[in-house]
From Swiss-Prot:
Protein name, as recorded: Uncharacterized response regulatory protein SE_0165
GO molecular function: DNA-binding transcription factor activity; sequence-specific DNA binding
Gene3D superfamilies reported in the protein's UniProt record: 3.40.50.2300, Homeodomain-like (1.10.10.60)
SUPFAM superfamilies hit by this protein: CheY-like, Homeodomain-like
Biological source species: Staphylococcus epidermidis (strain ATCC 12228 / FDA PCI 1200)
HTH araC/xylS-type domain boundaries: 152-249
Alphabetic keyword roster: Cytoplasm, DNA-binding, Phosphoprotein, Transcription, Transcription regulation, Two-component regulatory system
Taxonomic lineage from the root: Bacteria, Bacillati, Bacillota, Bacilli, Bacillales
Localization per record: Cytoplasm
Length: 251
């Protein structure tokens, strides 16, 4: 759904951010990494990410120069720095960056920022009908925490067992709550049924597998659909295109 470019000359920082942040929970499906501003600028121009996370002090092209280069592009920026330096903070303010984080990065703080960013991204106009279908299909999945205990438990069960051939009863049995209460409460808080959420989540997970060039029937099985034709039906229902059409658009 979303793309991010992580730019830092320290490998441990790049890989740490790439591997330790649960990007898919925030619907970032593609993560690019760069070792300096020159490499980052190339990736940004080529892939047009929604988010750029960049260090300030780097060889060849520093973070401030990178901000100058991308100031007219449609992306959000988070600045990283080992230095609590007012001049860098001022540069960030001048370029309207999303936030400024000191190293070592507090992952909880970064995830809070991502939560806010995702909501902003959803509010922007969609450039194509394909974009609109994508956002409409997966918007109900963006909120990851609710005020209701049972709803959160059902979401947890879905994320743990979506790849299995499960029923609503299978999902709520471990929670010890009546089926009617669980279904009613879930619909009130989330806005869609448990089955609808499960199928949308399965289709979202299938996109990552499509990018990895699995056979479509293999993907259907991996994300929990009992039949390949049901996978195709739900894919087209939510995204208004077939898996094959999606593959063509992704190339």
């Amino acid at each position: 759904m979303f793309k991010v470019v992580i730019c830092d000359d320290e490998r441990i920082i790049r890989q740490g951010l790439k591997q330790m942040i649960p990007w898919k929970e925030y619907h970032f499906t593609t993560i690019y990494t760069a070792t300096d501003g020159v490499e980052a600028l190339s990736l940004i121009r080529q892939h047009q990410p929604e988010l750029v996370i960049t260090d300030i002090r780097m060889p060849r092209k520093n973070g401030v120069d990178l901000l100058d280069d991308i100031k007219d592009l449609d992306c959000q920026v988070i600045i990283l720095s080992s230095y609590d330096d007012f001049e860098y903070m001022k540069a960030g303010i001048q370029h309207h960056v999303l936030d400024y984080l000191l190293k070592p990065v507090d992952h909880t703080q970064l995830e809070h920022i991502l939560d806010i960013l995702v909501q902003r991204l959803l509010e922007r106009p969609h450039s194509t009908n394909d974009d609109a279908a994508y956002y409409t299909a997966f918007q109900p999945l963006l909120k990851i925490d609710y005020d209701d205990y049972y709803v959160n438990q059902i979401l947890s069960q879905i994320k743990q067992h979506y790849h299995k051939k499960v029923t609503v009863l299978d999902l709520i049995n471990p929670i010890v709550v009546s089926e009617s209460y669980a279904m009613r409460t879930f619909k009130e808080h989330v806005g869609i049924t448990i089955v609808d959420y499960l199928n949308r989540y399965r289709i979202l997970k299938s996109l990552h597998l499509l990018d990895q060039h699995y056979k479509h029937y293999e993907i259907a099985e991996k994300v929990g659909f009992s039949e390949y034709k049901m996978f195709c039906y739900h894919f087209k229902k939510y995204l208004h295109m077939s898996p094959s059409d999606y593959n063509k658009l992704s190339k």
